[in-house]
Design a protein with these regions (language model features):
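Bacterial N-terminal signal peptides that target proteins for export
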Residues: 9-27
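Bacterial N-terminal signal peptides
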Residues: 27-36
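C-terminal motif of bacterial Sec signal peptides marking the signal peptidase cleavage site
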Residues: 39-40
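Conformational coupling and interaction surfaces
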Residues: 50-53, 72-83, 241-251, 260-384
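Active-site histidine-anchored catalytic micro-motif
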Residues: 50-113, 157-271, 276
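Surface-exposed loop and adjacent secondary-structure segments within mature catalytic domains
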Residues: 114-173
Length: 384
């Protein structure tokens, strides 16, 4: 149900027009001739055409398969994506637990040389998680039964999670660096080059901004999975779970002057539902039995085993595919957005549109090419 239906005229449809052929060819040949005389121009052309890999900082409340885990797998399997590192945050799972899951996926998917760091175990506001269940109970959303880490005993040791879960010793040693400092250091050492994929609560990014506010302008792009802009939330009627876990962090991030921000919100996530046939196509595209085991342990596998007619949203996976190929976006709206970060507010954690010029213009995808989306997912997974 949409709280504020998006007017059709505000949806920007991406399409290719038809232009006269000979002027384009003439100009193209002329440009190629000129650029061949100047090596610097050739390098610029290579960079603009994607000749260089896109560098990505992957920040996530990682789970083993759907949805963060599969997002990590397909990013690792994309030749023109270079993941600099994985930082974890509490959301779906505790940050230490997420680190164990991420390390195992990295071992199985060619990510042994990445940096792995357990990030923020708790949200920015002290005691925020203490009241989480009470808030949701008082104002439950459609998916209020799922509450992530707060539903489980807190995990504080990634190694014990790993060995208990996988009955083996890890091959990857994580870094002890503070996640927020790592994020800031990476951005400052490669200004204008890094894309942040933030598919969990925004705590690590917000902490990096608090200590190094200059990183916003030096980041190439940030892509979030979070929020519900013009539609209902899932955990409460107003808020989506990632942003509700740490509303203060979400607000700090989307208010920051990043050159380009994209929020993959429930507005588009709710349009992509995976049925059993599609899930089996994804599962069967994987060849590695060890990786398939992670899928079998996942809730999605069990869901379709118990109810073949069920469907499931894939949230974070959409953000990852957009990072790989933003051309899957077929409709979007650009708007100035903010987050309600007032703890006593009845709409705490809600993303909303504002006309305030002090807020950033953010792209909100509304439609994607679903055939292309699933083709990208299965083609990447088929490498394993």
């Amino acid at each position: 149900m949409c709280l504020n239906p998006v007017p059709s005229e505000t949806v920007v449809q991406q399409h290719s027009g038809k232009f006269p052929m000979y002027p384009i060819y003439s100009i193209g040949f002329l440009l190629l001739a000129v650029m061949s005389l100047f090596p610097g121009c050739q390098k610029m052309q290579q960079e603009e055409s994607g000749g260089d890999k896109k560098s990505v900082l992957f920040d996530s409340d990682m789970v083993e398969a759907f949805d963060d885990g599969v997002a990590f797998m397909i990013m690792l399997g994309t030749d023109d994506i270079k993941i600099k590192g994985l930082t974890t945050v509490t959301g779906n799972a505790w940050a230490q637990e997420s680190l164990a899951f991420g390390i195992r996926i990295g071992e199985l998917c060619g990510g042994k040389n990445l940096t792995y760091i357990a990030g923020a175990q708790y949200p920015i506001r002290p005691g925020r998680l203490d009241s989480f269940n009470e808030e949701v109970d008082a104002n439950p959303g459609e998916n209020a039964s799922y509450r992530g880490a707060v539903s489980y005993i807190e995990e504080n040791d990634w190694r014990s999670v790993y060995t208990d879960r996988y009955n083996r010793q890890p091959e990857i040693k994580p870094s002890s660096e503070e996640a927020s400092e790592y994020i800031a250091r990476q951005i400052l050492s490669s200004p204008g080059q890094l894309t942040i994929l933030a598919i969990g609560p925004c705590t690590n990014i917000a902490k990096a901004l608090a200590s190094h506010p200059e990183i916003a302008s030096q980041t190439k792009e940030i892509i979030y999975m979070g929020g519900a802009v013009w539609c209902d939330g899932n955990t409460t009627p107003y808020a989506e779970m990632n942003f509700l876990y740490d509303p203060e962090a979400a607000a700090a991030c989307i208010r920051a002057p990043f050159p380009k921000q994209t929020i993959v919100s429930l507005d588009v996530c709710n349009t992509v539902r995976m049925d059993r046939q599609q899930f089996m196509a994804v599962y069967q595209s994987v060849h590695s039995e060890e990786l398939k085991e992670l899928f079998r342990w996942n809730y999605a596998y069990q869901l379709f085993e118990n109810d073949p007619s069920a469907t499931q949203l894939v949230w974070d996976l959409i953000s990852a595919v957009i990072a790989i190929d933003s051309g899957i976006i077929t409709g979007y709206r650009d708007a100035r957005l903010d987050v309600d970060d007032v703890p006593d507010s009845p709409t705490y954690g809600k993303v909303y549109e504002t006309q305030s010029p002090s807020r950033q213009i953010i792209r909100v995808p509304l439609q994607i090419d679903q055939n292309k989306f699933w083709d990208i997912v299965t083609s990447r997974l088929s490498q394993y």
